[in-house]
Amino acid sequence: MEVSNLNFALVLLSIAYAFGTAVMRTQKHSPSFLHSVPVVGLRKQAFSITRASLRQLFGGITTLLEGYSQYTQHDQPFAMYDLSSRQETLVPVKDVKWFAEQPDSQLSSHGVRQERHAVEHLHMGVDVPATMHFIERITGDRLTRNLDLLAQPMHEEIQRCIETEFGNDPEEWKEINVYDSVQDIVMPTMSRVFLGLPLCRDTKVVNALKRYVMALGLATIFIGSLPRLVKSVLAGLVKIPLAYYRRQTLAVLVPLIRRQLEHPAEGDSDSEQETGFLRSCAKISEKNAVGGIGNVVEPEIIAQWIMWLAFAGSSSTIIQATNLLLDLANCPKDMEVIQQLRQEAVSSLKSAEDWKDPQSFNKQVISDSAIRESLRFHPILIKGLTKEVVPSSGITLPNGTQMSKGSWVGIPVLGIHRDKRYYPDPETYDPFRFVPFRLNGELQAGTAWGSKLDAAKPTTTYLGFGYGRHACPGRWFATLMLKMILAEIVLHYEIEATAPPPQMRVIGDAALPPMSATIRPIALVKTFHLPSSAPKKIARDTKKPHSKFFSRQCPVSPQNWNLVE
């Protein structure tokens, strides 16, 4: 991990200093709010807003869950201050669909992106609207619609990287840092998709992208958390190392991209496939003029787009995969979660051809449930989908509350994901939580559960990938990668935890993965083969509840479910 404790302490000191000097002055610039929206976390004390905002540095979960319990569970909105002293109103579950259906002319994420994501202060180079347009187009045109073409190279890279990180010794457990190892699996795999061979295996290329993504991620959290008046001042300092990593990455990518676009490998179908993503980028640049950019193929522009896409895609996938492996490693051994995932992988991935077919992974109901549950249990943002009120006349929430222009409105994601009304025993990670619904949906085609319960499909109570038309456009690609990583691991390794599962760590809205946590994998003596007596399906057994599986950490291995012939 390239982030030292000293750097982290400096970040916290800078935030505290920024609050002490600027918060009170920023309050008069905030949009007005009606008193009809209750504010949670605001106490009757000196510098109340400043102190309420500072408490969100590490206490955001407490404030959000307090407001959720008092108001959201009674279908009422509430407001809370964020780390930058902005007030945000959070709507109840019944209003999530209404919220997502509002046009950008009413509720827009542009202003939030500029401030909370610090785009206005950190962005360098290519135009932001052009970049966002590119990400949406390339994700739909090249990733989501071509998963069948991407599956084989993705698997090759995942297989190679996992063997490098986990080793192949069947006699000794190897302790690994989960976050670092996942990073060294995800980054080369995404580079394989974006850049192809041999660039994805060029350590100079991958390390440059990795450093840039890390620097941009830290800068986004830091600058995005500051009051507006000090953002631009400190952003100038933060942009110095960020600009350095950006120049380094561009210096590596631009000549390589130019060479591949100008001199494609003729007559080599594999090479053509490997450079297909770059050619799709060029096609979008040629045919779509956005923000003054377009109708021209510029390697510099394509390189910057790929850097932003790598940041958007890899950051979230690394966090999700890290949490997933830690969740599974900490399940009680008598649940036999890894064994059941292994049996499922063997039955659905019987040949090399199956690995090339994304439909093979759609059959993995246990894997899908484990991933979905991890995203429920560890949302990347504890509150999200935040948008800004656009009309000068404001907007009216479904309960009649009037929100003025410039107000921020969002959704209490963590509160919804921990609501007992939707998820029994919500404080526990249960990898089998969604298995019964998924099977029921498949047996009764056309039911609501059958169409909704997929790790890549958001609902109003499952917001791991956002919701509505602005949900993560790369969620099917990310889910396929997570399933591939999981299948490759369970087919070739046993894994065990080295310590109890760490608590969720939140800074502001961002739920960070436990970057120092470790697990121990050990290679299986040989590739697992499904025995003739192995389970064929999962069926409901109401007569034999598996009470021994109840656990505070990972309960109910399939409670009221068992494996049958």
Swiss-Prot record:
It is a single-pass membrane protein. It is found in: Membrane. The chain crosses the membrane at residues 3-23. One of its GO terms (molecular function) is monooxygenase activity. Its main location: membrane. Keywords: Heme, Iron, Membrane, Metal-binding, Monooxygenase, Oxidoreductase, Transmembrane, Transmembrane helix. PROSITE patterns: CYTOCHROME_P450 (PS00086). Pathway: Secondary metabolite biosynthesis; terpenoid biosynthesis. Its EC number is 1.-.-.-. The keyword Nucleotide-binding does not apply. Heme binds at residue 472. GO terms for cellular component: membrane. Its cofactor is heme. Gene3D superfamilies: Cytochrome P450. SUPFAM superfamilies: Cytochrome P450. The keyword Chaperone does not apply. Cytochrome P450 monooxygenase; part of the gene cluster that mediates the biosynthesis of enfumafungin, a glycosylated fernene-type triterpenoid with potent antifungal activity, mediated by its interaction with beta-1,3-glucan synthase and the fungal cell wall. The pathway begins with the terpene cyclase-glycosyl transferase fusion protein that most likely uses 2,3-oxidosqualene as substrate and catalyzes glycosylation immediately after cyclization. Belongs to the cytochrome P450 family. This is Cytochrome P450 monooxygenase efuH.
